[in-house]
Amino acid sequence: SKFTRSGGEANAVAIRIARASTEKKNVAFCGYHGWHDWYLSANINSKKNLDQHLMSGLNYDGIPQNLKNTSFPFPYNDFKYLSKLISKKNIGIIKMEVMRSIKPQDNFLQKVRNICNKKKIILIFDECTTGYRENMGGIHLNFKVNPDLAIFGKALGSGFAINAIIGKRKIMKKAENTFISSTFWGERVGYVAALSSFKEFERLKVFKKINKNGKIIKNIWSDLSKKHKIPINIMGTSAIPIFEFLNNHLQNKTYLTQEMLKEKILATNLVYVNIFHNKNNLKKYTKVLDRVFNNISRGNIKKLLNSKICFKPINRIN
């Protein structure tokens, strides 16, 4: 295993180790994996290549042109597209989030695993966001598909700076043939936080509680949308539920956040469920959301806004 202090670093380390383990250096990826050169180089071919992978509008200034045609994005759940990419671009590494808002369909993850086995491609799962939220490991365990390397962060240290790269011994051993180092990777706070977090995860059965509350939140959204006849699309895992308004999404989302803040609730259409969400929190949240949905159903929300309509989610603004 290797440890870093941030997810971007961990992703870059995983790519380095994987490339050291294969003759085929090109990467096919799906999802958001940080700011490093290997990832942003995908936009050299087209500035819109990364737009469908969480964060849009990313410039590649400062990325060497010779990295062009080394990293290629593919759409989630589109196995046919991925298969063609593998054939045409001599892919040696597949890097992806197991899932974010949309669940895998038509046995997608198993198909990816199978083609990796067949073509001798290294499969890396980025579990920085999903790890330890669905179980005491990665969400890939729920789908019974194992990667060659996996990356964990965020919940790993309960907010403290620590990320981990783990994987098959044969591949991880290749890290000895390249140079991977940082002065601050040796600090001890993150490691202690991770070990303490594991103890609390086990003692409090954290993932069971947050999944239970996440399902309650999804039901709240469903019930209120039906009550007020507001069409919404509910997605995501139980631990990280998300919904979108099918009409005037950004305007309604802005109003929702505005009204929640008035009641001292920090909330939007996405919830990272945590252990401290309790019945009283959910009761207050439901009461405010009921009022918000009622006002949205009446229309003219724009007149009730106290600020500009928010940007597209995760859209680059600097």
Whereabouts are the PLM-identified features?
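Conserved N-terminal phosphate-binding loop of PLP-dependent enzymes in the Aspartate aminotransferase
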Residues: 1-318
